[in-house]
Amino acid sequence: MKASIINKLDSLSERHEELQALLGDATIISDQEKFCAYSKEYSQLEEVVSTFNRWKKLHSDIEEAQILLDDPDMKEIAAEEIEANKAEIEQLEQNLQILLLPKDPNDEYNCFLEIRAGTGGDEAGIFAGDLYRMYSRYAESKRWRIEELSANESEQGGYKEIIVKISGEGVYGQLKFESGGHRVQRVPKTESQGRIHTSACTVAVMPELPESEMPEINPADLRIDTYRSSGAGGQHVNTTDSAVRITHIPTGIVVECQDERSQHKNKAKALAVLASRIVQVEKEKQAQEQADTRRNLLGSGDRSDKIRTYNYPQGRVTDHRINLTVYRLDEVMNGKIDELIQPIITEYQADQLAALSDQN
């Protein structure tokens, strides 16, 4: 492992010890804000420091075992121990490099998930409903909370568009690679000839930004319309104009929210989604301007950015970004999508490591 990496790990270990002492200080304990901040920093360093300590211990064990190589009775055991420790050290060094990668500060935030039906008419709307169910089941398995903000249901079931907020630990970091075009190939229930149709939906995942990070939005740039919201089949029809539609005139971004019975609450939620969308648009613009030659595994949420195909006749799901195919479509549609999400995260980390080594 490079000396620069070891120096970095040494400084993190020192900081970890310093934080441990601070968290036992009565003055810090009585200051709730500082105590919470230090506790968070301490827990963030825990994994990298414990991994580094294990790495150092194995090196120490190898040095001790090398002394025993001169002992005829212990030589064989010592050689086996050295070989095993070297293999573990190699794995730990890979883990440490990943742990040292720059963290996306947004990864710990809640997120807004938008699903829109694309090409394919009614079948695309039904598929949007299937995707929403898939993400809902996944969120339930993670003990995350889903809050529906806006839903435009399609006539044959499913949604023309649905926007939800998902809250929980590390939500955005887990779901951010879901942005992009999702394509389904199957025989629709309304198809009498048994022909396979291809339909598509777009998914966009954006972090819910804290107020301190929200962009300043000029009220003069907004057009705010109110209307009466209604649930499925006209249920829960409000007698007041509580639903809110906000148009950001400079970008043309439109956000609707009809979740709450209070117009004020709907407006606040719509503004939060709008702020996240504005930031996302700016990020995508910067990424295009940089014209990065590396693969951008982080989808844009653009319809043309096809990331995944769900093929029902073959029971397979293919992620086109990393050429990954799994033949467990039923499980995937029931929310078991970790086997699709984790390989993308791993590949993204590998790309980051490659970029860092190029810089060095």
From Swiss-Prot:
Residues 285-309 are annotated as: Disordered. Peptide chain release factor 1 directs the termination of translation in response to the peptide chain termination codons UAG and UAA. Belongs to the prokaryotic/mitochondrial release factor family. GO terms for cellular component: cytoplasm. This is Peptide chain release factor 1. It comes from Glaesserella parasuis serovar 5 (strain SH0165) (Haemophilus parasuis). It is found in: Cytoplasm. The modification N5-methylglutamine is found at residue 235. Keywords: Cytoplasm, Methylation, Protein biosynthesis. Residues 285-295 have a biased composition (Basic and acidic residues). The gene is prfA. PANTHER family: LD18447P. Its main location: cytoplasm. Pfam families: PCRF, RF-1. It comes from the Bacteria. NCBIfam families: prfA, PRK00591.1. InterPro entries: PCRF (IPR005139), Pep_chain_release_fac_I (IPR000352), Pep_chain_release_fac_I_sf (IPR045853), Prokaryotic/Mito_RF (IPR050057), RF-1 (IPR004373). Methylated by PrmC. Methylation increases the termination efficiency of RF1. GO terms for molecular function: translation release factor activity, codon specific.
